[in-house]
Amino acid sequence: MLKILRAKLHGIRVTECVLDYHGSITLDPEICGLAGIMPLEFVYIWNKHSGQRISTYVIYGEAGSRCCILNGAAARTCQKGDEVIISAFEYVAGPGDISQRSPVVLTFDAHNRVQERLRYIVEQKDGGMSFNIADDPLPEA
């Protein structure tokens, strides 16, 4: 089994840190829907400001809020305004399965509005692999 990227929220900003909570990260379900991130899904979080790396699970917050709230122990790893990368992974049988996947990557502005949706594309050819980043237009609002 090979663990590969399935979805990534790149540069989303922390909107709040709530220490007295059971744990997790609270995310806007509309943002999660665009990336394909599910409630209770295990995710890694990398803080671009501090370099801190943690893992937790996702809970959905209020739709349309653009929230990114670190809860419980995770709240100690970030401050409001920090840019983070949130990533979800999946297991595939082996390298031959990588080209059948195209992970979704969302990028954000300073107000957690989605700026672009990208896809990571891996192609197998001539006994090797190539990697490209492709635009994946957002649905009309």
Curated annotation (Swiss-Prot):
The keyword Nucleotide-binding does not apply. Its EC number is 4.1.1.11. The keyword Transmembrane does not apply. One of its GO terms (molecular function) is aspartate 1-decarboxylase activity. The modification Pyruvic acid (Ser) is found at S24. It catalyses: L-aspartate + H(+) = beta-alanine + CO2. Pfam families: Asp_decarbox. One of its GO terms (biological process) is alanine biosynthetic process. Belongs to the PanD family. Heterooctamer of four alpha and four beta subunits. This is Aspartate 1-decarboxylase. It comes from Desulfovibrio desulfuricans (strain ATCC 27774 / DSM 6949 / MB).
